[in-house]
């Protein structure tokens, strides 16, 4: 939905196929790995007030999922900031036969709440309607993730987190733009790994990094996990 305002909507399918071809090349070079087909938020990220109705979002996500499904191992719904957007995305993703992971973005100062203000725990009702195969929290500050994971764990699914490296993203409900934020300079690879190992201690088995968490962070996290005796699939 961000290509259309730029007059690039006709490239939607081709751009997906180009990205999918490149990720298959990367996996072949690495010799291992799962390919997750990403489906992000509709409208502006971090603006749950701009979420389209469920029937609209479900159709848009189904279109995307059908493009991705033949080329990926799983569908990853990510940076979801409201219960209704989760409903639409899950319905769309389930139009394919691929496993579906649902990842939500939480408030930076209260990881028990989605950016909409709705409780993370309320995902239980959404998942009862349309199931997922795993649940995660992403694209929020690492400081918020422990609380988010505590709310996700009782859902009874594999769970995890991949935080961002942004400054606090404050609620914003004016106009149609995204809230202001910037990259942090205090989130070193060592500090990010400290957070991530705490998530593992909570039982999380799906760990990674989102925006502004780069290769150096992931490389150091890999080393720390190995050193702690964890197996990395």
Where do the model's predicted regions map?
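Domain-level signal for soluble alpha/beta catalytic cores
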Residues: 1-233
